[in-house]
Design a protein with these regions (language model features):
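Hydrophobic transmembrane signal anchors and adjacent membrane-proximal interface regions, especially
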Residues: 4-5, 107, 111, 152
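C-terminal amphipathic alpha-helix
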Residues: 31-87, 123-190
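Short, solvent-exposed, charged loop/turn and helix-capping segments
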Residues: 87-125, 178-190
C-alpha cells in the first residue's frame, strides 16, 4: 500500500470577524466608512477563499485516501490536479483581500485600527506564501502521486508550508489581541 504524506489541517482559516466602529465621525464617506467598506471588500474575497480552500483540501484528502487504498495512482493524479487548481483559485481570492487591507492602513484613523489592519495584512501575506508552497506540493504530487521519487522534496515543501501557516496564525493572534484591547474601536460582527 502506497503512503503519501498527510497534509496537516490549517489551524487558522482567515475571516475578518471585526467591523470598524464609526465612533463619532458621522461623516458619510469619511475614513471610518471607507475602512468599513474596505474590510467588507476584503471579507468577500476571504469568504470565497475559505470556501475554495476547503474544497481543495477535501479533493486532496480524497485523492490521498484513494492512493493509499491502492487505487490507480494515474487516475488520482487528475484529482490532485483538481485540488491544485482549486487551491490556485483560493490563492487568487486571497490575493484580492490584500489591497483593501493595505488601503485601510493608509486611512486617517486611530493608530490601533492601522495596527489591526497591518497585522491582518501580515497574516494574509504569510498565508498567501504558505498556500503558494502548498500549490507546489500538489504539482509534485501530480507528477508522482505515490511520492516514490519525490518524498524528501515533498517533506521539505510541507515543512515550509507549515512554517508559513504558523506565521500566519501568529499574525492573526496579534490582530485579535489588538481588537480585544480596543473594543471601542473594533467591534465584533455577527
Amino acid at each position: 500500500m502506497a503512503r503519501i504524506l498527510v497534509r496537516p489541517a490549517l489551524l487558522t482559516v482567515i475571516m475578518l470577524s471585526l467591523a470598524l466602529s464609526t465612533g463619532c465621525s458621522g461623516l458619510l464617506g469619511g475614513p471610518y466608512d471607507q475602512a468599513n467598506g474596505l474590510v467588507d471588500e476584503a471579507n468577500e474575497a476571504i469568504e470565497e477563499h475559505n470556501r475554495l480552500f476547503e474544497e481543495a483540501r477535501v479533493a486532496y484528502e480524497e485523492a490521498r485516501e484513494a492512493v493509499e487504498a491502492g487505487e490507480d495512482a494515474s487516475d488520482e493524479a487528475e484529482h490532485i490536479a483538481q485540488a491544485r487548481e482549486t487551491m490556485q483559485e483560493a490563492w487568487d481570492e486571497l490575493e484580492e483581500a490584500r489591497e483593501p487591507l493595505s488601503e485601510v492602513q493608509a486611512l486617517d484613523v486611530e493608530l490601533e485600527i492601522g495596527e489591526y489592519a497591518r497585522s491582518l495584512s501580515e497574516a494574509v501575506d504569510a498565508q498567501i506564501s504558505a498556500e503558494g508552497q502548498e500549490i507546489d506540493f500538489y504539482e509534485l504530487l501530480e507528477q508522482d502521486p505515490t511520492l516514490e521519487n519525490g518524498r524528501i522534496e515533498a517533506e521539505d515543501i510541507l515543512s515550509e508550508v507549515d512554517e508559513g501557516y504558523e506565521e500566519a496564525e501568529e499574525a492573526y493572534e496579534r490582530a485579535q489581541e489588538i481588537a480585544d484591547a480596543n473594543p471601542e474601536l473594533l467591534k465584533e460582527r455577527y
